[in-house]
Amino acid sequence: MKRIIPEPYLTNSRVLRKTHNPWETKLWQYLRAGRFCNLKFKRQVQIGQYIFDFSCRGKMLLIELDGSQHSELHINQYDILKQDFASKQGYKVLRFWNNDIDKNINGVLEIIKQNI
């Protein structure tokens, strides 16, 4: 059965896929086109009302990259709701800070590998 995604969510998801930040771009170079453990990852994937940075649906894994704004209380509370929703759908959510991508991309990739 085809999923019906409301147009505002679909439009936002499309915009996010076209305009990504440098940290998403860097991680995407490792995940795209089956380069990482021969798995299929997608960017800016909509699940319910939320959009996640990366998903590997075959492994029920979601990856979120967080900048410093995610330490603000209202954004942090939103992230908790988002993660709880994904968990209830059967997904495992991994979160990394942007500086982890800059300073320790190999460590990030190892953590992802351990969780697939």
Give residue ranges: language-model regions.
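Solvent-exposed, charged helical/coil patches
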Residues: 1-39, 88
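Basic, amphipathic alpha-helical patches used to engage nucleic acids or provide basic targeting signals
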Residues: 16, 45-115
